[in-house]
Each structure stands twice: as structure tokens, then as C-alpha cells.
């Protein structure tokens, strides 16, 4: 089965697992998914991530979700740029999520990073998603 938007699939898996209180989420792995999960870990939205090698040269990404007082730390997780309509922003047009309380994840020429890191480096790019 082919996926038209693997990033949206990962975000929906995380959102659904957090909504029902699961501890971990498993998804097919790719470099961009691992980079997005690493940004979420660095920003404190998830506890840990692991990449497991499977047969047939495939790998699986396992994300350990984070909860605070029984509620998921990730309250909002929304895909912004999608396969049918890519959303690119310059360094001065990068969106702030909830006036800086959340983050937006940006794919830049220097890698995948948060909006704050992209502003600090003075680069723009494709706005992948919002997290709050």
C-alpha cells in the first residue's frame, strides 16, 4: 500500500495514540520522520525514539509519548504544508504558534528544525507542521 503523505500519516498516528493514552507509537521509518521525531524529542514533546531494522531492508520508528498529569504533552499537532499544496516561507514570514508557546517544524536547506532555530540561522523553508 502506498502513502501519499507519509508525514501526515506519522502525525495522525501520534495524535491518535496520544488521544487514547498509548505509551508508544510505531510507524514506518524514513530520514524525514526520524528528523521530525528528533525535533519533538529535543523540544520536550516526546520522551524517546528508537529506529528498529526489520527484514527486507525496512525500518520502523518507535516513539515513546510523554504525558503530564495524565494528559498528553502534545495538545495540537497539525500538518501545514501538504503534498498537494506546499507552503514555503522566508525567514521573516515563519509562523509563530500560539504566540511562541508552540513550535512549527520547518524543513530548510540546513535540515529540519524549529521556527526559532530557523530564525536564528536566518533561513526559511517549507513549514511542515505545528505542535503545541
UniProtKB/Swiss-Prot annotation:
Entry's Gene Ontology molecular function annotations: rRNA binding; structural constituent of ribosome
Gene, per the UniProt record: rpsH
Role noted for this protein: One of the primary rRNA binding proteins, it binds directly to 16S rRNA central domain where it helps coordinate assembly of the platform of the 30S subunit.
Species of provenance: Stenotrophomonas maltophilia (strain K279a)
Family stated for the protein in its record: Belongs to the universal ribosomal protein uS8 family.
GO biological process terms on file: translation
Protein name: Small ribosomal subunit protein uS8
Cellular component terms (Gene Ontology): ribonucleoprotein complex; ribosome
Alphabetized UniProt keyword annotations: Ribonucleoprotein, Ribosomal protein, RNA-binding, rRNA-binding
Subunit comment: Part of the 30S ribosomal subunit. Contacts proteins S5 and S12.
Domain of life: Bacteria
